Amino acid sequence: MPESNLTKKAIALSAKELTKEKPYDKISISDIADRCGIKRQTFYYHFQDKYELLVWIYFNELFAPNMEDISLENWDEKLGAILTQMQEEKKFYINTIKHAEDYIIQYMLEVAEQTFEEAIDKLDEKSHLKNEERGIFARFFAYGICGIIVEWAKGGMKMAPEKLADYMREMLEKCKQAVYILSLIHISEPT
């Protein structure tokens, strides 16, 4: 593993440890650098600010490992794995969602919207939807799922991750059925 990645992981670990002691918005770059045993300049060599670090952690530790090979058939299992990992590191994820909410939500929305756009493309092979409609549907589902995850985290992650993922799968299945029924109605309508 390149030295740069080792340093980034050490910085990330230090930030995660600090979230057990105080809110993320109260953690300074100096706090992270001191905990990691590096100079502030070293931190800034790797990250622009603590929010870029946070996005790096979410991407490299939560999303990238769990989103690999995601498909329409397994997305709920992948979501369950993400939620389980969040629950295993509950203090970190609750802290960062509560105290860096804008940054985290924006990042989660970008990841979710891209994932849903790809899923909609696969579902709508015959191109019944216009690009504008695809974007709206993708944003609708991205905001819904991200909102549920944020509320789940803020509420203390009380519901089991698998149960929450199952609820989301059921909801999306019902939406998919509704879209199918509407498409049949649309096809059978006289013009």
Predicted regions and their residues:
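Append "Primarily bacterial transcriptional regulators
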Residues: 11, 30-35, 43, 86
